[in-house]
Swiss-Prot record:
Residues 368-598 form the Sigma-54 factor interaction domain. GO terms for molecular function: ATP binding; ATP hydrolysis activity; cis-regulatory region sequence-specific DNA binding; DNA-binding transcription activator activity. Residues 115-185, 234-305 form the PAS domain. It holds the Pfam family PAS. The keyword Lyase does not apply. This is Putative sigma L-dependent transcriptional regulator YqiR. It is found in: Cell membrane. Its main location: membrane. GO terms for biological process: phosphorelay signal transduction system; positive regulation of DNA-templated transcription. The chain crosses the membrane at residues 13-33. PROSITE patterns: PAS, SIGMA54_INTERACT_1, SIGMA54_INTERACT_2, SIGMA54_INTERACT_3, SIGMA54_INTERACT_4.
Length: 692
């Protein structure tokens, strides 16, 4: 119990005395007031509480709480000085509010206990058997008389299909017809004749909640049948309260078996009632231990426990409390809070920093999806290149995953424990890019940070720097970058001192650098510096066999981001995606799937063709019919993988013939590396005769 000292026995002190006397957890050690006629002193004496005009002896008893009601600031200050470090000194007004709230809380809890006890008594004191099933035909409620007449204990049947417990039941028919059936004769088991009333339970919105069955021996007649139907209102009210909550709620019985969940729970976890009701309490947990089971074991509530739930591993905070009626454990109630909605600040931060990101590499080669020959070649090249210190040039169209490759190369290298920094060379002006890359000295320019600033090359020392869109650099920046690659040192803007740096450079471009060299917009010497280890990443249209695996991974990601539970694509939808030419590559595929899932009905689990955004699926066919001069191979009736290989082999052969078997020109025309061309020629057994 908490020891309390009241200083001041006027009206406020007396009012607090009245409240605290009724509280079982409070022990009032004394009431003190300088005025011997104070009303609170007389009342305290009536209750056998010590009274005094001096509080100092009692403060030495180290009370837990001292309530000051005199209004004298000097007394309050002296109390604060003399109190024990564990003693709390509260102004009387604050204490009055706090203890009033405590009293109100206790009153509400007592009312709730009395109501729950009353409902339980009503349900189990009736002479009629009562069974309630949910919309999945599983037993939710089973009273004492039902146990007696059916011959099975409640614990044996809760959560089981009604047909398994009572094979002759007609309750599932009520779920289909929603039509009540009154006073129906039925044989229960082998000999017991009963009269039963079956009722659909429907909420005010017209939604079917389940079915209630009330039955009795035929000798008892049906005088009390209508009274039992009042339980429908009780059940509907309790269900509606839970279902109206925006917080996810789950209820289990004393054995840890799921009894009830609401719509918010299903939306958050991605689990339906069928997957939870009647199942163990740890069914919904993907990471962590069941707090329901812990509460049932300890009979104590738990709060603020982090875990992951559902197939999408939603991160949540869980509060669980036991349901105890008259000392008997009935189950537990859990409230689940979603804490995963804070994620989209990264994009805003990137814009604020003008698309320059200084992040640790997030991806590995395991995150790169691809089983096509071209993708496997690119992956093998990247893994080999990661083990070398050479500068790597990633080439590929926008959206093919060049940044993903850069992350993976860094994580595979011996620099993985140091920084990985990404810079978009096209996002900044020349002056701003120079100061970001190389840093600047104090006073280098107007608005420069006092004391200067390190550049990204210095920040990435002993790590990796990813220069995206390197083909967009100006001639001046190209010259400065060349110096860094040659000399392995930088000079800050406004400075003269050379600062050595040890940085692995990974560059990327989606433009034709060779053409830029021919046009004089890209330095040849820089080209040879960055092109020591080129890797060509194929566009999506050249690896259509990867669309299914990519879609599975992207749908999983979007499920986590949007809180959905979509399982995948129908075959028609997959064929539609495979027929498209994907100018935006994997980025466009993610966009298409994301839009489809946003507008997908929350209860639907599969993306159909009709759900996909309208795009030019016939574009490839139209393009090829308008005089391209390409002779298509006969692929009618072939499987997709075989048709793609035939098409690819035919295209390579025709391109070789067009360029008189010059392998360099052929590779350039096809947009692949020489090594990749050799690989495919060997794979398809294409003739080498006449090649130069």
């Amino acid at each position: 119990m908490q020891k309390v000292l009241i200083v001041g026995a006027g009206k406020r002190g007396t009012a607090l005395l009245h409240i605290l006397i009724k509280t079982a957890i409070i022990d009032i050690i004394a009431v003190v007031d300088k005025d011997p006629e104070a009303p609170g002193l007389k009342e305290a004496e009536q209750y056998g509480i010590a009274v005094s005009s001096d509080w100092k002896p009692y403060i030495q008893q180290k009370p837990d709480i001292v309530i000051h009601t005199t209004g004298d600031q000097a007394v309050f200050d002296e109390l604060l000085q003399r109190k024990h470090e564990d003693t709390i000194v509260m102004p009387g007004k604050m204490a009055y509010i706090v203890f009033q709230l405590m009293e109100e809380k206790q009153h509400l809890i007592q009312m709730l206990k009395e109501q729950t006890y009353k409902y339980d008594r009503i349900f189990n004191s009736t002479h009629d058997g009562m069974i309630f099933i949910d919309i999945n035909e599983e037993i939710i409620l089973f009273n004492h008389m039902a146990e007696k007449m059916v011959g099975k204990k409640r614990e044996e049947v809760i959560g089981r299909p009604i047909k398994e417990v009572i094979p002759s039941t007609k309750m599932p028919r009520i779920l289909k017809t929603r039509v009540p059936e009154y006073n129906q004769k039925q044989l229960l088991g082998d000999h017991l004749q009963i009269v039963t009333t079956r009722l659909p339970i429907i909420d005010e919105g017209g939604r079917l909640l389940g079915a209630l069955c009330v039955f009795k021996d035929i000798t008892d007649a049906v005088e009390l049948a209508e009274e039992v139907t009042n339980l429908k209102q009780v059940r509907t009210m309790l269900e509606a309260i839970i279902q109206s909550s925006d917080e996810a709620i789950s209820v289990v019985d004393e054995n840890g078996i799921g009894l009830l969940i609401n719509k918010a729970y299903t939306k958050m976890t991605g689990l339906s009632e069928k997957e939870v009701i009647g199942k163990p309490a740890n069914t919904d947990i993907s990471e962590g231990e069941s707090m329901h089971l812990k509460v049932l074991e300890t009979r104590r509530p738990v709060r603020g426990v982090r875990m992951k739930v559902g197939p999408n591993e939603k991160e949540v905070i869980v509060n669980v409390a036991p349901v105890i009626v008259d000392g008997i454990l009935k189950g537990s109630v859990g409230v689940i809070h979603d804490v995963s909605e804070i994620k989209m600040l990264t994009a805003e931060l990137n814009r604020a920093r003008q698309i320059i990101r200084t992040l640790e590499a997030k991806y590995t080669f395991d995150d790169i999806i691809g089983k096509s020959e071209q993708m496997l070649v690119a992956l093998e090249q990247a893994k080999l290149g990661a083990k070398t210190p050479a500068t790597i040039l990633l080439r590929g169209e926008s959206g093919t995953g060049k940044e993903l490759f850069a992350h993976a190369i860094h994580n595979e290298s011996d620099r993985k424990y140091n920084k990985f920094i990404r810079v978009n060379c096209a996002a900044l002006s020349e002056n701003l890019l120079e100061s970001e890359l190389f840093g600047y000295e104090d006073g280098a320019f107007s608005g420069a940070k006092r004391g200067g600033k390190k550049g990204l090359f210095e920040e990435a020392n002993n790590g990796s720097i990813f220069l995206d869109e390197i083909g967009e650099l100006t001639q001046n920046m190209q010259a400065k970058l060349l110096r860094v690659l040659q000399e392995k040192e930088i000079v800050r803007v406004g400075g003269t001192k050379a600062i050595p740096v040890n940085v692995r450079v990974i560059a990327a471009t989606n433009v034709n650098i060779e053409k830029a060299m021919a046009d004089g917009t890209f330095r040849e010497d820089l080209y040879y510096r960055i092109n020591r280890y080129p890797i060509s990443i194929p566009p999506l249209r050249q690896r259509l066999e990867d669309i299914e695996a990519l879609s599975v991974r992207l749908i999983q990601k979007i499920n986590r981001d949007y809180g959905r539970n979509v399982k995948g694509l129908s075959q028609q939808a997959l064929r539609a995606l495979s027929a498209y030419h994907w100018p935006g590559n994997v980025r466009e595929l993610e966009n298409v799937l994301g839009r489809a899932m946003i507008f997908l009905n929350p209860h639907m689990e599969w993306i159909e063709k009709d759900h996909l955004p309208v795009f030019e699926l016939e574009q490839k066919e139209n393009d090829t019919d308008q005089g391209t001069g390409f002779d298509f191979p006969d692929i009618e009736g072939e499987k997709l993988s075989v048709a793609v290989e035939k098409f690819e082999a035919h295209l390579i052969q025709q391109t070789l013939e067009k360029h008189h078997f010059n392998r360099t020109k052929t590779a350039k025309a096809l947009g692949v590396s020489i090594r990749n061309l050799y690989y495919k020629m060997d794979k398809y057994g294409l003739a080498n005769e006449g090649m130069q």
